[in-house]
Every structure is written in C-alpha cells, then in structure tokens.
C-alpha cells in the first residue's frame, strides 16, 4: 500500500465517525493540522444539505439540554428518572458526564418547548425527536423514558436512546432515534466520545 492509501483511510475514518462529507472531512483534517486549503463555491444543493445537517445537530444539542433539565428540575423527572438511575447505581458524576436525561410522559412536551424556543418542526422530524402524523398530530418519540444521548467522535449529539420506565406499558422497552442524515447506527458506538477523552 502506498502513502495515498493511508491518507484515504484517514479521510474515510473521519467521514464515518464524524458523519462528515468527503469535503468536510478534508476541512476537518486541514484545520486540525493547520493546513490551508483553497475551496470552490458549493452548489445550492450542497449548501442545503450542509445547512440541514447543521440544523439537525443544533436541534439535538438543544434536546439534550432539555432532557437533562427535565431530569433535574421537573418533579416527574426527579421522581421517575433520577430514581431509576439511582436504583441502578448510576452516580451523579456519571449521569452528568454522559448527559443523561428524561423525557416527560406527555404527548408533545418536547415538541411544544422546541417550537416555543424557535426550532422548526421539519428538523424535529428529521432527527426523529418527534413523530408527525398525516392528520397534523405530533408525538414526542421518547416520552416517559430516561434518555441516553449518542455522541459522535467529535462530541456532537447525533441521536438518542430511550428506555421506558412504566412496567405495565405495552410498548417497546427501548426506542432509538431513526437513521438520518446525521445518524447511521452502524457507524456509532455508544460512549466512544467519552472513551477518547481518557
């Protein structure tokens, strides 16, 4: 194998684990190693895709903070979520480090809070935070669940996992974000970002 193969593997590794396009991966590496690159103008389609990805990451970042706030500040979050984590031996520092949270057991609490905060419904749908129905109704995907954010290698929240707490629920015990422009389940390993910080 030549030196070019080594560079290709590095770029593809960054593409896969950072959820970046080829060009964004090159920019990432250039910035990391202080290499100046000359860029061409992006097409309108490329600009739109980049903008959508950035918007989805921004929405997920907001949602992670929202879920953590509900866990610590809402009575339901403290009574159900914090109790669940305590019963399973999660220490306070672990809960905070992994940015765990809680989604209220209400049909559209996250959706209403997100819209009120100025986030667009389309990105709440694209990230899988909400499920929209043809009749116009919207449900929070993770309601009534403890939340486990999934981080990319760079620390960006790309998805969520949620575990239902009610024992009598006739629903899936675990729910994950669907695959999206920013999340491909086969490319992510839960906790890898924090493992790399060690």
Where do the language-model regions lie?
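Conserved active-site segments centered on acidic
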Residues: 24-77
């Amino acid at each position: 194998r030549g030196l070019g193969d080594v560079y290709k593997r590095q770029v593809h590794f960054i593409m896969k684990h950072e959820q970046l396009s080829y060009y964004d991966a090159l920019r990432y590496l250039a910035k990391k190693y202080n290499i100046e690159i000359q860029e061409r103008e992006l097409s309108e389609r490329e600009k739109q895709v980049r903008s959508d990805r950035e918007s989805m990451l921004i929405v997920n970042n907001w949602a992670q903070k929202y879920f953590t706030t509900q866990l610590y500040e809402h009575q339901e979050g403290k009574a159900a979520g914090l109790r669940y984590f305590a019963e399973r031996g999660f220490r306070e520092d672990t809960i905070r480090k992994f940015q765990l949270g809680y989604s209220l057991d209400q049909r559209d609490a996250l959706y209403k809070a997100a819209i009120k905060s100025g986030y667009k419904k389309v990105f709440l749908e694209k990230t899988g935070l909400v499920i929209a129905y043809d009749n116009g109704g919207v449900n929070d995907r993770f309601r009534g669940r403890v939340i486990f954010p999934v981080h990319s290698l760079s620390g960006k929240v790309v998805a969520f996992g949620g575990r239902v707490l009610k024992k009598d629920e006739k629903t899936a015990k675990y729910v994950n974000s669907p695959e999206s422009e920013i999340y491909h389940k086969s490319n992510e390993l839960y906790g890898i970002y924090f493992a790399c910080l060690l």
